[in-house]
Amino acid sequence: HVRANGALVLARNADEATVLQEFADTRLKQEGYRADLLSARDVAGLYDGQLAHHCMGLRGHDDLQIYSREALPAITRYLAEALGVTFITGTLARAVENGLVGTTAGDFQGKHVFVCPGHDYLTLLPERFAPLNLEITRLQMLRAAFETNPVALDRPLLTGLSCVHYGAFSDLPSAHALRDVIQARTPMLLENGIHLLISPTPYGELIIGDSHRYGQDAFPFNDEAVDNAMLDLASQALGARLRVVERWQGVYGAHGPAPFSVMPVDAATTVAVMHSGVGMTVGLAIGERTVAGAIG
C-alpha cells in the first residue's frame, strides 16, 4: 500500500512560518523541490477547516508513504514467490571473507557478498565500523486513534518542529532562530530530540513520533513524559483528542561521518550500512547503486 499524496508541513506560529517562508524563497527554488507554500487561508481550506489554527503550510508533492509493518513482509513475499529469492531466517552470520559466509546454518559461498547489518556494528567486521564512531538512536513511537474530531488525513503531517531536525531546513538562519525559541519555551523537546511526525495508517489510525536518545546501546526504558509530549503535540496539531493504542521503540544507527557508508572489504565483500534516519527513504537506491557498482 503506497500513498503518493505528498506531505504537509504546518507552521504553528510566526517563528515556524518564517522558516517555511525562507525555505520557499531560497532552497525550494534552488533545489527544484516540487512544493507549494500555503497561506493561512489555504490551510484553513484543507480537511474541512480542521487545521485552520495554523498560520502557514508547505505542501510537498513527491513524498511517498508506506505502511511499513505490512509493506516489508509483502516485499519479502514478492522476492520469494516472484523472483525465487531464498531467505534463511533464524540464522546468525558469524564470519565473512572472500565470498565465504560462515553461519549457524552452515557455510555459503557467493560470487560477491553484501553485508547489511543494520545497527549491529559488533557481530561482523567490527574493525571496519570502529573508526566511524557510530552510535545508536532509540525512538519512542505511538499508534493512536481519534476519540473526537477525526481528520481524514491522507498524507504525513509535520510541524515547524521538524524544521530544526531535518537538514533541508535546519541550517537556514530562520531555523537557528526557531531552535533558540524552542530552547527558551520548551527545552524538553530539544533535550529529548522530539519533533512531530504524524502518518495515517490505512485503517484510520495515526503513527506518531518521534523522540531521539543516542548512545552505544538502545536504552530499554521509555519515558512517559516523552510519550505525553508527543501525544499533546499531535492533539494540538489536529485539533482532536487522541487515544494511544500501541507503543514501541524504533532503533537505528546514528552519527558517523555521513548518512551512510559503503565500504569494500575485499574483492568479494562489500559492507553497506545506514547510520541516519533516512534508510526507508534512500535505502533501496543505495542497494541498487552498491550492487551495480560491485557486480555490474
Each predicted region: which residue ranges?
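Dinucleotide-binding Rossmann-like beta1-alpha1 core, especially the glycine-rich loop
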Residues: 1-46
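A short coil-to-beta-strand element that immediately follows conserved catalytic motifs
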Residues: 2-4, 88, 154-156, 238-250
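Helix-loop-beta segment of a Rossmann-like dinucleotide-binding subdomain
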Residues: 2-9, 44-83, 211-214, 268-273
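Glycine-rich nucleotide phosphate-binding loop and flanking beta-alpha elements
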Residues: 16, 120-122, 214
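Helical element adjacent to the flavin cofactor pocket in flavoenzyme catalytic cores
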Residues: 57-112, 116-117
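Central helical "cap/lid" subdomain
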Residues: 107-173
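Contiguous C-terminal substrate-recognition/catalytic subdomains in enzyme active sites
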Residues: 157-161, 165, 170-222
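C-terminal catalytic lobe of FAD-dependent flavoproteins
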Residues: 193-195, 201-207, 213-296
